[in-house]
Regions:
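Conserved acetyl-CoA-binding loop-helix of GNAT-fold acetyltransferases
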Residues: 106, 112-128
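Conserved GNAT acetyl-CoA-binding A-motif
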Residues: 98-101, 120, 127-153
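Conserved acyl-donor/pantetheine-binding loop and adjacent beta-alpha core of acyl/acetyltransferases
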Residues: 71-104, 148-149, 172-187
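A short beta-loop-alpha structural element at the N-terminal edge
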Residues: 6-22
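Helix-loop element at the rim of GNAT/NAT acetyltransferase active sites that forms part
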Residues: 24-39
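C-terminal "cap" of GNAT-fold acetyltransferases
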Residues: 153-159, 164-198
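Active-site rim helix/loop that mediates acceptor-substrate recognition in acyltransferases
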Residues: 35-64, 73
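Alpha-helical elements of Rossmann-like donor-binding domains used by nucleotide-donor carbohydrate transfer enzymes
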Residues: 21-25, 46-47, 118, 122, ...
């Protein structure tokens, strides 16, 4: 697909006007593999509020004709919740040294257009510009390779992440509960963290 999208960067309190759009997008995209999330826009908006409260956070938004078609988030790990900080602390990495990349969500019709690279480029540049982080990091959902719900044509992001310099960190795993389609609340492993020197 040819896309006439634009990329916008919003920092700290500039994020606030976009919370509802990004919350709705997250609910829509996270219904699919691998999240299978039975989402709630109000919960998502509250979750994203941590980004609006962080003076050094960033939203990278992909837009087409004024509509948000993709979003990628980041904030200093020290500004995130204990659940996100704990694996780093346990792994002897000071949260003050980490700029944490939240999720990237993109409508399926716009995948393969280079937007994922733009999301990483802008978040990495934002973290570097802040000048105080040794690491950029994120996590992703781990599902069993033989999970019968995995789409036959699913292609993971591991190769993309490795090409960008991110590595799994064995032993650094967090557990996050969320409501899964048809299952209710389920405790999920959010995989070994991926880290890269900033």
């Amino acid at each position: 697909m040819t896309s006439a999208h634009t990329i916008g960067l919003f920092r700290g309190p500039e994020i606030t006007p976009w919370l509802d759009d990004v919350a709705r997008l997250r609910v829509a995209v996270f219904r699919d593999w691998p999240y299978l999330y039975e989402g709630d826009a109000d919960y998502e908006r509250d979750y994203l509020g941590a980004y609006a409260r962080s003076a050094e956070s960033v939203f990278v938004l992909a837009m087409e004709k004024g509509e948000v078609i993709g979003a990628s988030t980041g904030l200093p790990l020290a500004d995130d919740t204990e659940a996100f900080r704990r694996p780093f602390v346990d792994g002897a990495i000071d949260p003050e040294d980490v700029f944490y990349f939240g999720e990237s969500v993109l409508l399926p019709a716009y995948r393969g257009c280079g937007i994922g690279h733009a999301f990483f480029d802008h978040r990495e540049a934002h973290a570097r510009a802040l000048g105080r982080f040794a690491w950029t990091a994120f996590c992703a959902v781990d599902r069993a390779d033989d999970d019968p719900r995995r789409p036959v044509d699913h292609r993971g992001n591991e190769v993309f992440w490795r090409k960008r310099g991110y590595e799994r960190r064995p032993g650094m795993t967090m557990r996050l509960p969320w409501s899964e389609i048809g299952q209710g609340e389920v405790d999920h492993a959010a995989p070994p963290q991926r880290l890269q020197h900033a």
